[in-house]
Amino acid sequence: MGASPIFYLHSMHEGVQVSSKLEQLQALLAPVVEGLGYQCWGIEYVSQGKHSVLRIYIDKEGGILVDDCEAVSRQASAILDVEDPISSEYTLEVSSPGMDRPLFTLEQFASHAGEQVKIKLRSPFEGRRNFQGLLRGVEEQDVVVQVDNQEFLLPIDSIDKANIIPSFD
């Protein structure tokens, strides 16, 4: 059958304002989370007018309990009240990444190579924004995903959202 084709998406820097807001929130909140003894798995900020949501995903060996989320929520709320990086109203959510954990960093993508993933891009590539397939790994700044018999190299900066698809085998 031969080698499967490889497609490469060149990154276009859309959503820079959102990205810099996320970077600002990450820089502010990651030290708080880590100072409490947790790993800051990732942060999502979804701005939807009056219904904006700030999600902080935390993890630790042995898993996360409700008390862990509560402790991080209290500390994060305090620092957010003082620093006020979000001018509009928002809801703060703190949770574990869960079974369908979101992936944010190249290291997270690399550590979950071999698993099924669902990836949504910020803008279409090859006429599509959604990719579901086997996570092959990473190459430099690209996430490699195999959909059917095709490999796609997707720059991490072009990914809007990515999640593991849980396996119940």
Swiss-Prot record:
SUPFAM superfamilies: YhbC-like, C-terminal domain, YhbC-like, N-terminal domain. Keywords: Cytoplasm, Ribosome biogenesis. Gene3D superfamilies: Ribosome maturation factor RimP, C-terminal domain, RimP-like superfamily, N-terminal. It is found in: Cytoplasm. It comes from the Bacteria. GO terms for cellular component: cytosol. One of its GO terms (biological process) is translation. Pfam families: DUF150_C, RimP_N. PANTHER family: RIBOSOME MATURATION FACTOR RIMP. HAMAP family: RimP. This is Ribosome maturation factor RimP. The lineage of its organism: Bacteria, Pseudomonadati, Pseudomonadota, Gammaproteobacteria, Pseudomonadales.
